Amino acid sequence: MPEGPLVRKFHHLVSPFVGQQVVKTGGSSKKLQPASLQSLWLQDTQVHGKKLFLRFDLDEEMGPPGSSPTPEPPQKEVQKEGAADPKQVGEPSGQKTLDGSSRSAELVPQGEDDSEYLERDAPAGDAGRWLRVSFGLFGSVWVNDFSRAKKANKRGDWRDPSPRLVLHFGGGGFLAFYNCQLSWSSSPVVTPTCDILSEKFHRGQALEALGQAQPVCYTLLDQRYFSGLGNIIKNEALYRAGIHPLSLGSVLSASRREVLVDHVVEFSTAWLQGKFQGRPQHTQVYQKEQCPAGHQVMKEAFGPEDGLQRLTWWCPQCQPQLSEEPEQCQFS
């Protein structure tokens, strides 16, 4: 599923439509009837971790105070949530996002349970409704264009993907949402202290979570502490920190955990910057056969016995597994 940096790019693409009225709808969604959005006004959009939220109102003037502006490309270690420079991404006409079709199979990370936040269709006439968009494996948002088939399916048909939701706006443009779950919510699920791309990200909370007596690769995917972090960021941060994915957090020194969190934030921020600047993503170990040092990369699915197994890439030489004895701090 799209990770935090890509979902923030989706947010950037949707933001220019804030303040416009939905004049026509379409899509294959069964749980949410696209027609229920007809004539509503898109008044706000927010992004939190891997989730995108869209606020719809009945009237043009009912937008909430302090509506979220489009996030700017981060210039510092932590993503800032201010206004974006339109020159870096351009106008919405003809733009579309990359759908990440080259990725291997991804599953929902541990701790990302949608059930407690979902509601039934919002009552008719209820102002301030938030549409919660949870993206699937190849989830994407397209602007003023539709996704096209890149290859034939198993039956040999060149059938274009079917959008889950299409919103046409009074300004003439439209948005198409693919491979996603749509549900109404009374308000966005907001926990900025666990969002790895938020300036309010709580490092202390993340470091404490990493100290648990379980493999660090499990903890990194726990959205309660690392919202927006997915399999790509997990693999790349662990490699850059030189930590074996199955190393128990409880045996890592405080300094090693600090380094790991640093790499999580740095890689995520660089990925987001690249999205805004049109630069391709470069990975060192994810889906690689060799690491930058020329060593053979191992691949295996890891996860809790009662949880989801996620494909993991690591270099046994650059990321040696630690014993279960805590690391000792060295003083010079």
Curated annotation (Swiss-Prot):
Domain notes: The zinc-finger domain is important for DNA binding.
Single Gene Ontology BP annotation: depyrimidination
Protein name, as recorded: Endonuclease 8-like 2
Record annotation: effect of changing C318S: Loss of glycosylase and AP lyase activity
Gene Ontology terms: cellular component: cytoplasm; intracellular membrane-bounded organelle; mitotic spindle; nucleoplasm; nucleus
Function: Involved in base excision repair of DNA damaged by oxidation or by mutagenic agents. Has DNA glycosylase activity towards 5-hydroxyuracil and other oxidized derivatives of cytosine with a preference for mismatched double-stranded DNA (DNA bubbles). Has low or no DNA glycosylase activity towards thymine glycol, 2-hydroxyadenine, hypoxanthine and 8-oxoguanine. Has AP (apurinic/apyrimidinic) lyase activity and introduces nicks in the DNA strand. Cleaves the DNA backbone by beta-delta elimination to generate a single-strand break at the site of the removed base with both 3'- and 5'-phosphates.
Gene name of the encoded protein: NEIL2
Phylogenetic classification of the source organism: Eukaryota, Metazoa, Chordata, Craniata, Vertebrata
Family from the record: Belongs to the FPG family.
Zn finger region (FPG-type): 284-320
Active-site feature positions: P2, E3, K50, R310
InterPro entries assigned: DNA_glyclase/AP_lyase_DNA-bd, FPG_cat, Ribosomal_uS13-like_H2TH, Znf_DNA_glyclase/AP_lyase
SMART domains: H2TH (SM01232)
Catalytic activity annotation: 2'-deoxyribonucleotide-(2'-deoxyribose 5'-phosphate)-2'-deoxyribonucleotide-DNA = a 3'-end 2'-deoxyribonucleotide-(2,3-dehydro-2,3-deoxyribose 5'-phosphate)-DNA + a 5'-end 5'-phospho-2'-deoxyribonucleoside-DNA + H(+)
